[in-house]
């Protein structure tokens, strides 16, 4: 999957670890949305 920035990673992508994974159709079972203000399309999820 494509890495994405969770709220816990920091305010921006520069210099921060991207601990989330981008899912177009929503988070799979056992994962949760980790970005409160997510992208317009898809979700940023982590296990």
Swiss-Prot record:
Alphabetical keyword list: Disulfide bond, Ion channel impairing toxin, Nematocyst, Neurotoxin, Secreted, Toxin, Voltage-gated sodium channel impairing toxin
Record-linked InterPro entries? Anenome_toxin (IPR000693), Myo_ane_neurotoxin_sf (IPR023355)
Gene3D superfamilies in the cross-refs? Anthopleurin-A
**Organism per entry:** Anthopleura xanthogrammica (Giant green sea anemone)
Return the Pfam families for the record.
Toxin_4
This molecule's function is given as:
Weakly inhibits voltage-gated sodium channels (Nav).
Q: Which cell locations does it reside in? A: Secreted; Nematocyst
The family this protein is said to belong to: Belongs to the sea anemone sodium channel inhibitory toxin family. Type I subfamily.
Record-level Gene Ontology MF annotations:
sodium channel regulator activity; toxin activity
Q: What is this protein called?
A: Delta-actitoxin-Axm1c
Report the superkingdom from the record. Eukaryota
What lineage is this protein's organism placed in?
Eukaryota, Metazoa, Cnidaria, Anthozoa, Hexacorallia
BP terms from Gene Ontology? regulation of signal transduction
Record keyword Disulfide bond present? yes
| Gene Ontology CC annotations of this record | extracellular region; nematocyst
Disulfide linkage:
4-44, 6-34, 27-45
